[in-house]
Amino acid sequence: EGVIRSDSDELEGRFPTDGYANLSTSCLCCGGLRFAAKLAASLGDNDTAALYNSRAEALGEAIERYFGATLHGFETYRYSKGFDTLRAWICLPLCMGLTNRAGGTLDAMLSPYLWTEEGMRTCEKSAENTSDTIWDRSTLYGFKCAFLSGAGDRIMQPFLDYCHKRLVCDRVPYAVEAYPEGEKRHLSGESALFVRVVTEGLFGIRP
């Protein structure tokens, strides 16, 4: 069907999928192809750049066909077939330049289904998920996608609130892995992603 087959993602099975394909893996692959194309072009290898861009385009279309869905009235994406709950990773298509469902996705992200004072829930609370677990990784991708989509006016205050909590409040001065899981352990990967929110999201400086 054109998407990437994957039985899990970086959440390592903490939240359910169909074990066949998920939105995160396909979006990360799409983004990787786009950046690989830019690298090839910068090295003068235009044939390889064209090949990777073509593959990224085809994968983007497959993501739209396979994962595109209307959930709670929002035109956004399902995470995996058979799981019609909102997930934080709906922000990834926007980060990878897939903007067909930008408006509905931003509305869903900032809705009470996902947004909390700590960031985005990994999954909306439902029979499928009863936890309020947030991962800074997906929250930071959410900030980045909102800025890249021109929705800075909507996301700036939540971003400033997040900066206050993480940089000058109870757990400083880094982004955290997850909460309540892990009791807000610090991870370098999330902190590096925070920097990318500023350089790529706010300033538009992209590789």
Regions found by a protein language model. Give the residues of each.
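Aromatic- and histidine-enriched alpha-helix N-cap/loop-to-helix transition segments
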Residues: 20-31, 84-88, 133-141, 147-150, ...
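Extended glycan-interaction surfaces of carbohydrate-active proteins
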Residues: 1-21, 58-136, 160-177
